[in-house]
Amino acid sequence: MENVFDYEDIQLIPAKCIVNSRSECDTTVTLGKHKFKLPVVPANMQTIIDERIATYLAENNYFYIMHRFQPEKRISFIRDMQSRGLIASISVGVKEDEYEFVQQLAAEHLTPEYITIDIAHGHSNAVINMIQHIKKHLPESFVIAGNVGTPEAVRELENAGADATKVGIGPGKVCITKIKTGFGTGGWQLAALRWCAKAASKPIIADGGIRTNGDVAKSIRFGATMVMIGSLFAGHEESPGETIEKDGKLYKEYFGSASEFQKGEKKNVEGKKMFVEHKGSLEDTLIEMEQDLQSSISYAGGTKLDSIRTVDYVVVKNSIFNGDKVY
C-alpha cells in the first residue's frame, strides 16, 4: 500500500447539479431488510448510546447498534424493542458465555434483526467461529462483523457468513491502539476503507476517524454503505456520559471501549477518556447531518446517495482546512 490518504487529504469534485433544492436529495440507505434515513450509525459505545437513544433512533428510522457492556440487559432490550414494532440491533463479543447467549436467544425464539460481533481485532478465528455460530442458531439475523482493516479480513469474514463487515482499527478519537500497539488504520482510514471496499461483495461499515459531516460523503465515495461515528455524537443532551462544568462551559465525558473507565481496570488499555463540549440536542445534529449530506448529493450531481460514489476526487496533502481548526 503506497499513496495512502485520510479524510482531510481528499476533496471531492463537484458535478453538474440537477436539483432545484437540496431538499430533493434522498439520503436513505438500505442495510439488510430495512431502510434507514441516513447512512450513519452512532458508535456502539457506552458514552454514545443507551436504551433511550436506541429507542429514539429506531422510532425515527435511524440505524443504531446497542453496545455490549451490560450483557444481562440484552434479552429484555430485544423483547422491549420488538414488542414496540422496532428493530432490535445488539452487539456480542466472542467469549464462551456469548455462545450460550446466542443459543439462549434461539431457545427463546428471539431473533434480533441485527447482531454486531464487535472486537478490536476482528480478523480472527474467534470472530469466524462466532459468525458461524450465529448463522447456525439465528439464521435470520443480519450479522455485522468487525473490526478489520484489510481486504483479506473482509473476504474471510464474508465467506464465513457475515452480512456486512466493519472497517477501522484504531482511527477513533478516543482510541489509542495506534499509539499503544503500532498497528491500525489511524491516519489512513479512508485509504483502508477504499482498499477493503474493492474486495468486498457485501456492505461495509466505515468505523472511526470521522471528524466532520463532509467525511460521511467521503466515506460513501470510497465504498461505505454505512458510517459509524463516535466523537461527533458524543456530548449531546441525551448522551449517557457524565456532564461537568469547566470555566463556565459544559462538557460531557467520552471514553473508548477498551479504556480503563470502560473496563474498570488498567489492563490491556487501548482507549482513553476525554471531555467534549456540550452539543445540545441529538435531533439537531442528525438534522444537520442529513442537510449536509443532501448538499453533498447535490454537489455530486445526483438525487440519491449513490451519485456520490462516482464523483472524481483529488488528494491535497493535509491542506483542505488551510490552517482552520475545525475540530
Swiss-Prot record:
**Molecular function (GO) terms listed?**
GMP reductase activity; oxidoreductase activity, acting on the CH-CH group of donors
Task: Please give the biological process terms from Gene Ontology that the record holds.
Answer: 'de novo' pyrimidine nucleobase biosynthetic process; purine nucleotide metabolic process
Please verify whether the record's keywords include Aminoacyl-tRNA synthetase.
Answer: no
The EC number(s) attached to this protein equal 1.7.1.7
**Catalyzed chemical reaction(s):** IMP + NH4(+) + NADP(+) = GMP + NADPH + 2 H(+)
Q: Name one Pfam family in it.
A: IMPDH
Q: Which PROSITE patterns match?
A: IMP_DH_GMP_RED (PS00487)
Q: Where does NADP(+) bind?
A: 204-227
Q: Name one GO cellular component term.
A: cytosol
Among its keywords, does the record have Oxidoreductase?
A: yes
Q: What class of enzyme is it?
A: oxidoreductase
Annotated S-S bridges = none
Q: Which UniProt keywords are given for this protein, alphabetically ordered?
A: NADP, Oxidoreductase
List the catalytic residues: 175 (thioimidate intermediate)
Write down the PANTHER family for this protein, in alphabetical order: GMP REDUCTASE (PTHR43170:SF5)
Q: Which family is annotated?
A: Belongs to the IMPDH/GMPR family. GuaC type 2 subfamily.
Q: What HAMAP family does UniProt report for this protein, alphabetically?
A: GMP_reduct_type2
Tell me, in a sentence or two, what this protein's role is: Catalyzes the irreversible NADPH-dependent deamination of GMP to IMP. It functions in the conversion of nucleobase, nucleoside and nucleotide derivatives of G to A nucleotides, and in maintaining the intracellular balance of A and G nucleotides.
This one is known as GMP reductase
